[in-house]
Regions:
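Conserved PLP-binding active-site segment in aminotransferase class I/II-type PLP enzymes
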Residues: 1-80, 84-88, 114, 167
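PLP-dependent aminotransferase-like
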Residues: 88-169
Length: 169
């Protein structure tokens, strides 16, 4: 039996994963301005003024509406909350399946489980660790309702290929 690389076995990945800078000066200035107010949240556990966010949150949501050309945009407190909202917006029913990559955060599978749906894991590509469209297609069943595309290490998921698969089924 071979030994894991961590225990002096042979390394299987010999290259470094590329770093990706995703926060620019404009974003840093905006966050700094809010941080200096000393109040990051207006939510105190119950309904009240600011329950849905104050001026910066509302301004952000409106800018998202305009940028993405959508009627609604909802700011959430975390990536996990956003995923739970996104899965809920899909009209997923208990027992439905959503395909997602094996290399991702636990919040992806948790957001599926929050709606009593079933996470189905597809392999990832060696080159960029994103979901492998060929394996996605192998995992599709009559219960499959969605494919969760996850960007990894600043590399975009193969959206075009995943869209083709989704339209096919």
């Amino acid at each position: 039996m071979s030994k894991l690389a961590i225990f002096v076995g042979k390394k299987s990945i010999l290259r470094k994963i590329r770093a990706h800078k995703s926060i620019g000066k404009e974003e840093a200035r905006a966050v700094s301005k809010i941080m200096k107010t000393g109040n990051l949240s207006a939510f105190y556990g119950t309904w009240g003024e600011g329950f849905y966010g104050r001026k910066y949150v509302k301004r952000f949501e409106k800018s998202c509406n305009k940028y993405f050309k959508v009627k609604y945009a909802i700011a959430v407190n975390s990536w996990t909350s956003g995923l739970i909202c996104a899965v809920g917006a899909l009209d997923i029913n208990p027992g439905d399946e959503i395909i997602l990559p094996t290399w991702t955060m636990s919040a992806c599978a948790t957001s599926i489980l929050a709606w009593n749906a079933i996470p189905v894991f597809a392999d990832v590509n060696y080159e960029d660790y994103n979901i492998n469209p060929k394996d996605v297609e192998k995992k599709i069943t009559k219960k499959t309702k969605a494919i969760m595309a996850v960007d990894i290490f600043g590399h975009s998921a193969p959206i075009k290929e995943l869209k083709k698969i989704a339209k096919k089924y």
